[in-house]
Amino acid sequence: KTSRILNIEWSPEYAESVRYENASLYHAIRYAVQHPEEVCFSPSAAFHHANPTRGALFCAFSGQVIASMKIYYEFGLCGAYIDLDGHYGNSIDNSRDFVKDIDYAISPVCGNINIMASYEKYLEELRSNLSILRTEITEGRVHYVVFCHGADSHEWDELASQLTTEEWVECSRIVYSFIKEIESQTHRQIPLILALFGGYRRDDYNSVLSLHTADLVTCLNILCGHNIDYLPEVTPRKVL
């Protein structure tokens, strides 16, 4: 079943698009674990509210669970998701009693990091969760990281609001610096995959795109040795 909010009837075309969406994340993870020296990007979203028996909100299938289960069965690897979308991603937790072996595929300790605070408290909780993830990675229990930096955690988004522009970009700095520090500590590269997730600005789509651009630039500067100067352009939301 699809969710009512999607307002889409099942059709061959819709089924095909869902296959591409789910395959995008799976292949990004698969490539990253085989080539950890490269950061992989999946321009995908609409995953983290789906339940095992039905879609929910904008999400038809839990691509996170599908991708990580396939990766586990192929490579025996366990992943963690840093989900900084503006809404709690429930699909992983809702699948734990339904999907066999999911605790081996997505860490039950820190495999589904979501932050439900705002502003400075949000940053504090992110750092605290990453401290737990650091231990899981360095002790060999988590083998890859998927960073889902939804733009709807920005304070001017239509459907959520937690962070200023500066704080939203600071989350990117915190996560990419975290990966860099672990790589320096362990002397090995950590497979890192990026995904889009939420972002709802009917009044100004460019604000969403600018935030995602800022995130990618931060990744390039911290992890890939670039020195790109970019300031996100995010306008206050207009009520339509």
Summary of predicted features, one role per range:
Residues 23-38:
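Short, charged beta->alpha transition segments
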Residues 30, 39-182, 202, 217-218:
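Conserved alpha-helical scaffold segments that buttress catalytic/binding sites
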Residues 12-19, 23, 54-62, 206:
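Short, conserved micro-motifs enriched in small and acidic residues
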